[in-house]
């Protein structure tokens, strides 16, 4: 009897376990199908519950601390190469004879560029996420001074006499000019939108500053990106040259004679329905040229070919003899070599009308492209040796520097910077994000529309059932892992759905990512994309008087007349901390005649100041316009009773909102404080 009871208990226990397992298996299959939007994804628990860990022991075990070389500079004698290791917050020093790293200097957060004085004894490094420069003594390898800059310092250049230092402030769209004798900022000039690079002309008479984002433009018009020209003598902006139908002008260079100034650029076709991708009607890539003669003609030429695109051109350098230009294409892991004499001949024989035609001509590059040189993953900054014989290439996602012989146009060496040898899942995802290999003929990658994993400020006319409807304003990808759903219409409940089959159908026009690649891409998006610190509007967390008043407006429950505001129409209902989104759908009265009836997912507000334009279709150029132009009926929060000063204060508060981590630990206390203030 006891034996039978034991058998019964054993089999009963097994039956219960089996039933539990069967039910759990059914649930897990349903869960995976829901997350991925496919029926056969071999997703396992590790994909979502290990690879996407941001903090803790698991995150430390599965991730690595990579270097990610970004920009380069050479000592005047060419014996030492200085490498900005962006992810390591370090400046690496490489012996160019032995091709070994010989020193490492800790610098500030998110370093961008380095420049070396002609005596080879002093360097300056821009720390983009710290709003300062480090002055470094290259003998002692010590930081000897810190200079406060504008917001987001990027490229730094010396005036030809080295008396002044020009700093491109990328986030505040300015150029800071420092007197190097007094170490003080003496001027700050307005540049284009999101400037990143600058270069002096060979005669030292002027500097040009490139920009990445379009200027504010009338709604529904093509992008217009500024190249700012600064007069060196007066240190004033003397001209603002506008490149139409172009953006992401990352870097620029002058020929030694000064006859040409050349910038990298991308020509987006964002206003055309994306139904002719094979003809380049999505993105084309090339260069912008300004002639010193011919009344300063401005020309755009492509580096693409009819059946192959060379996406995301980043840096450009020109040989000392002025015969060749080298361009790094970070989206396809290629260096393009251009014959500048062929460029000159083409310009000399062509009218402006003909050159305008060439700006969209995919075949014209055959005339001036000499060679394509493959590199490691994600080539970024370039620098030529003083004699022009060697080109150094920062392979950002390889943690290496490629060395190319500029005479044979072959890679002759690879400098290992001693980064981790293991490629993590998230690192592979970052490579995929920055590579165009999954789109039709390599025409664009995730980075193209999401530079710095953010957004490009453009509105796209994506292919759909009805052409020209449901225009989409590009959304940021920063810190979005915890705030589904995705897309403005909230159709995708997970990043797997967002970047899976639906993504390939609408955007890439090729096979969808395989399962391992999709796992990797999701891991990177969830764990590897952070918000920059909001040093411009909220550097310490202590709000200004105007921001405090705006905070009260944001959390108010009654109008100025004392009338209670319905809960569903209070700002904080749809935009509660820490992400300032409730992740729910809402109608805010902003549908246009070209939109299908739909609700919209409440967007996050972290670092909202750097995400213009606003609304689902980008129709609001500024935060103010959300209420001054697009809220007549108080459907997007009650605002029509507000005084102008109150609106100004509200906007100031919105600009102060920073990363969600500052609000996560005290959401309830945060709400309680607001209720008490009200």
PLM regions: where:
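Short loop/turn segments that connect beta-strands within beta-propeller blades
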Residues: 95-99, 137-141, 179-183, 231-235, ...
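A detector of repeated loop/turn-to-beta-strand junctions in beta-rich toroidal repeat architectures
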Residues: 42, 88, 130, 172-174, ...
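Short sequence/structural segments immediately N-terminal
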Residues: 4-5, 19-75, 88, 284, ...
């Amino acid at each position: 009897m006891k034996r039978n009871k034991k058998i019964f208990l054993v089999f009963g226990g097994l039956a219960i376990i089996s039933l539990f397992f069967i039910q759990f298996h059914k649930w897990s299959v349903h869960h995976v199908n829901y997350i991925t939007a496919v029926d056969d994804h071999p997703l396992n628990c590790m994909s979502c519950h290990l690879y996407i860990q941001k903090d803790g022991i698991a995150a430390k075990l599965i991730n690595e601390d990579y270097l990610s070389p970004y920009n380069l500079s050479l000592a005047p004698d060419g014996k030492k190469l200085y490498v900005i290791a962006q992810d390591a917050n370090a400046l690496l020093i490489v012996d160019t004879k032995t091709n070994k790293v010989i020193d490492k200097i800790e610098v500030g957060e998110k370093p961008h560029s380095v420049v070396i004085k002609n005596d080879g004894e002093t360097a300056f490094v821009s720390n983009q996420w710290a709003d300062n420069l480090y002055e470094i003594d290259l003998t002692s390898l010590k930081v000897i001074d810190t200079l406060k800059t504008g917001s987001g310092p990027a490229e730094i250049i010396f005036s030809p006499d080295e008396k002044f230092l020009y700093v491109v402030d990328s986030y505040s769209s300015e150029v800071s000019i420092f007197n190097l004798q007094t170490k003080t900022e003496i001027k700050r000039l307005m540049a284009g939108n999101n400037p990143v690079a600058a270069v002096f002309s060979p005669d030292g008479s002027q500097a040009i500053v490139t920009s990445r984002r379009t200027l504010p433009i009338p709604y529904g018009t093509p992008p217009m990106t500024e190249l700012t020209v600064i007069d060196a003598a007066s240190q004033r902006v003397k001209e603002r040259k506008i490149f139409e139908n172009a953006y992401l002008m990352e870097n620029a260079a002058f020929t030694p004679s000064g006859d040409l100034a050349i910038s990298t650029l991308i020509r987006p076709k964002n206003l055309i329905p994306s139904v002719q991708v094979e003809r380049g009607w999505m993105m084309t890539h090339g260069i912008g040229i300004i002639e010193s003669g011919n009344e300063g003609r401005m020309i755009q030429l492509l580096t693409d070919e009819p059946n192959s695109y060379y996406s995301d051109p980043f840096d450009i350098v020109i040989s000392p003899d002025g015969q060749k230009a080298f361009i790094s294409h970070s989206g396809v892991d290629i260096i393009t070599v251009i014959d500048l004499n062929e460029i000159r001949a083409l310009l000399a024989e062509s009218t402006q009308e003909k050159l305008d035609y060439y700006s969209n001509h995919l075949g014209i590059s055959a005339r001036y492209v000499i060679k394509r040189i493959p590199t490691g993953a994600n080539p970024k900054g370039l620098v030529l040796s003083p004699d022009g014989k060697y080109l150094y290439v920062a392979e950002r996602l390889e943690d290496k520097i490629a060395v190319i012989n500029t005479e044979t146009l072959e890679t002759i060496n690879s400098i290992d910077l001693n980064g981790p040898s293991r490629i993590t899942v998230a690192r592979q995802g970052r490579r995929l994000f920055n590579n165009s290999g999954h789109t039709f003929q390599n025409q664009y990658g995730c980075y193209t529309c999401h530079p710095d994993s953010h957004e490009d400020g453009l509105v796209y006319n994506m292919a759909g059932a009805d052409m020209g409807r449901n225009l989409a304003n590009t959304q940021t990808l920063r810190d979005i892992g915890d705030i589904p759903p995705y897309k403005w219409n909230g159709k995708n409940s997970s990043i797997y759905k967002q970047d899976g089959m639906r993504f390939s159908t609408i955007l890439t026009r090729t096979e969808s990512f395989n399962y391992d690649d999709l796992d990797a891409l999701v891991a990177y998006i969830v764990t590897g994309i952070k918000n920059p610190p909001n040093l411009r509007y909220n550097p310490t967390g202590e709000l200004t008087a105007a921001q405090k008043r705006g905070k009260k407006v944001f959390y108010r429950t009654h109008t100025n007349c004392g009338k209670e505001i319905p809960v569903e129409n209070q700002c904080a209902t749809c935009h509660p901390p820490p992400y300032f989104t409730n992740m729910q759908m809402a109608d805010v009265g902003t549908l246009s005649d070209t939109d299908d009836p739909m609700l919209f997912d409440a967007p996050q507000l972290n670092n909202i100041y750097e995400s213009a334009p606003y609304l689902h279709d980008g129709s609001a150029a500024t935060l103010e316009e959300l209420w001054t132009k697009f809220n007549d009926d108080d459907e997007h929060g009650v605002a029509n009773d507000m005084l102008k000063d109150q609106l100004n204060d509200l906007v100031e508060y919105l600009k102060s909102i920073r990363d969600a981590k500052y609000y996560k630990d005290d959401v309830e206390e945060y709400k309680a404080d607001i209720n008490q203030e009200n």
